[in-house]
Regions:
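Rossmann-fold NAD(P) dinucleotide-binding segment
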Residues: 1-13
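A generic structural signal for well-ordered alpha-helical segments
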Residues: 3-4, 27, 31, 82
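Rossmann-fold NAD(P)-binding glycine/threonine-rich loop
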Residues: 13-38
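Glycine- and other small-residue-rich loops at beta-strand/loop junctions that grip anionic moieties
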Residues: 13-16, 20, 41-42, 66-70, ...
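Rossmann-like dinucleotide-binding core of oxidoreductases
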Residues: 34-99
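C-terminal substrate-binding/catalytic lobe of Rossmann-fold NAD(P)-dependent oxidoreductases
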Residues: 74-211
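NAD(P)-dependent Rossmann-like dehydrogenase/reductase catalytic/cofactor-binding core
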Residues: 188-249
Length: 249
């Protein structure tokens, strides 16, 4: 990221939330020195979900924001399972906990622990003679991936994995529940939802839209690192400003 930012206008889907500030600073320095623009973390989370969290919190500052991911395949978690000795292939689904979603929509404003919002479901193909009990234990106890979650492990054949789990679906929800009024007696909910047949296809389209914005902004002389919330929506569109005013506003 930082290397290419010093050479070209760039757009990326950097997705490690906790490291975004440091990544931004590294990219920003090189992009500014080169007179280039780099739009970082511009997938759907971080990305589109970031925009919706910001809008919701700006409009309803008294409230709580909740982000649920899934149901969908997590590529990182699937890779982690494949690294377990004896595993031939695997897919892992991240699934929102329905009771948690319902509690948020009721306006309970709950404080969740890590494992209370999502559960993990794993479909695993093992090598001949592999110890399934050991593999299941290693998966469920894996720190940072599964140990904090309700995790189910299903052992299936390679044919079943290819037939039933070959796609790359994903999605999620951003829900903001807020209150207004002198006595905070008026309740409001903002919800943004994605249901994706193909996570890679959708993410690529998001990146293309922000590439359009990067080109336009650089033509105006803008340089340095930007996040998705720094970009005015009109820069993403294929339509002219006049067309936007006629058909969207």
């Amino acid at each position: 990221g930082p290397l290419f930012a010093g050479l070209f206008n760039t757009v990326d889907g950097y997705d490690t939330h906790a490291k975004v500030p440091d990544y931004f600073n590294a990219v920003n320095k090189n992009a500014l020195d080169a007179g280039k623009i780099s739009i970082i973390a511009s997938g759907w989370d971080p990305g589109l979900f970031s925009i919706n969290r910001l809008y919701a919190e700006a409009i309803l500052p008294v409230g709580n924001t909740y982000t649920f991911w899934g149901k969908g395949i997590s590529q990182g978690h699937s890779d982690a399972i494949r690294r377990v000795k004896g595993v031939k292939d695997a897919k892992q689904y991240t699934i929102p906990v329905e009771n948690a979603v319902e509690a948020v929509k009721r306006g309970d404003m709950p404080d969740f622990t890590t494992g209370e919002m999502h559960k993990r479901e794993c479909f695993v193909v093992v090598e001949d003679g592999a110890d399934k009990k050991r593999i299941e234990h290693e998966i469920k106890m894996m720190p940072d991936y599964f140990s904090d979650y309700d995790t189910e492990v299903h052992f299936i054949t390679e044919e079943e994995l290819k037939k039933n789990h070959s796609g790359m679906p994903h999605g999620g929800l951003v829900i903001h529940y807020g209150k207004t009024g002198l006595k905070k007696s008026h309740n409001h909910m903002i919800e943004y939802k994605l249901e994706l047949d193909s996570n890679p296809d959708f993410t690529a389209n998001v990146l293309i839209a922000f590439a359009r914005a990067a080109y336009r902004l650089n033509q105006e002389g803008v340089s340095g690192a930007k996040t998705v919330v720094d970009i005015a929506p009109a820069y993403l569109s294929t339509k002219s400003a006049d067309e936007i005013r006629k058909s969207i506003i």
